[in-house]
C-alpha cells in the first residue's frame, strides 16, 4: 500500500519506497504543517541531487547539512535543530540497523518491540512513536503481532485522529477537525481552571 498524504506525487512516492525518507518526514512533523514536513524529504533529495543514504547523512559535515536545511524555503522552521536530529537519526540507523532504515520495522518481532525501537529514535516522543507504528500498520501493512495494542488509540479502525489516518483531502479535514476540537477543549479547560483559581483566591 503506498503512502497517500496531502503532498505531491513525487513526495508520496519517495515516502512509500524509501524508509529513511518516511522516518525523516515523521521526525520533522512537529511545529510545522504536515504538508511541509512530509514534503521536506523530497526537497532534501532535490537539493542534494540524489537520494541520500543513512551513512551519507551520518557522515555529512554538520554545518553543510544545516546550510542545506536552511536554504529557502527552509525544510523546517528550526533548520539547525532539525538538521542535527536528522543526523542523529541517520547515525542510529547506521549503528543499530546496518544502515537499513526499514530494518527498524522489518526485523521487529512484535508490536511492543517495534514501539520500543521507534521510541528510541530522536524526535519520537510517546505519542509520535505510537502514531508512527499505527501509520506503518494502516498504510504500509507492517503489522507484527500486537501492533494495534502497541499503538492505541491511533490504531483504531475508522479513526481520524492522526497522520496515520490521512489518505486524502477528506480524511485530512477530519483529522484537522478532531485536533481543533482537542485544542478548543483544552483551551476551555484552561480558562475554567483559571476562573476557579481566581474564585478560590477571592474566597480565601
Describe the residue ranges of each PLM region.
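Structural motif
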Residues: 10-21, 32-35, 76-81
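A positional/architectural concept
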Residues: 20, 34-50, 54
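Short, aromatic/basic-rich helix-turn unit that serves as a nucleic-acid recognition element
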Residues: 23-27
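C-terminal accessory module of base-excision DNA glycosylases/AP lyases that mediates lesion recognition
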Residues: 1-12, 17, 111-115, 126-204
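Alpha-helical ds-nucleic-acid-binding substructure associated with the helix-hairpin-helix region
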Residues: 48-119
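Short helix-capping/linker segments at secondary-structure and domain boundaries
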Residues: 30-39, 93-99, 141-143
Amino acid at each position: 500500500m503506498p503512502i497517500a498524504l496531502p503532498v505531491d506525487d513525487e513526495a508520496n512516492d519517495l515516502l512509500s519506497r524509501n524508509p529513511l525518507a518516511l522516518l525523516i518526514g515523521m521526525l520533522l512533523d512537529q511545529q510545522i504543517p504536515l504538508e511541509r514536513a512530509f514534503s521536506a524529504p523530497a526537497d532534501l533529495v532535490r537539493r542534494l541531487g540524489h537520494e541520500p543514504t543513512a551513512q551519507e547523512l551520518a557522515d555529512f559535515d554538520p554545518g553543510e547539512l544545516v546550510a542545506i536545511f536552511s536554504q529557502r524555503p527552509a525544510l523546517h522552521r528550526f533548520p539547525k535543530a532539525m538538521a542535527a536530529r536528522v543526523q542523529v537519526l541517520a547515525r542510529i540507523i547506521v549503528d543499530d540497523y546496518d544502515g537499513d532504515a526499514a530494518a527498524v520495522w522489518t526485523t521487529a518481532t512484535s508490536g511492543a518491540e517495534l514501539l520500543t525501537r521507534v521510541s528510541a529514535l530522536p524526535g519520537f516522543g510517546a505519542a509520535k512513536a505510537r502514531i508512527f507504528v499505527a501509520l506503518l500498520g494502516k498504510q504500509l501493512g507492517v503489522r507484527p503481532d500486537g501492533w494495534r495494542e502497541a499503538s492505541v488509540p491511533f490504531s483504531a479502525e475508522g479513526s481520524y485522529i492522526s497522520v496515520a489516518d490521512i489518505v486524502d483531502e477528506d480524511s485530512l479535514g477530519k483529522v484537522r477537525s478532531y485536533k481543533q476540537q482537542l485544542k478548543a477543549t483544552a483551551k476551555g479547560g484552561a480558562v475554567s481552571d483559571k476562573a476557579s483559581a481566581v474564585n478560590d483566591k477571592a474566597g480565601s
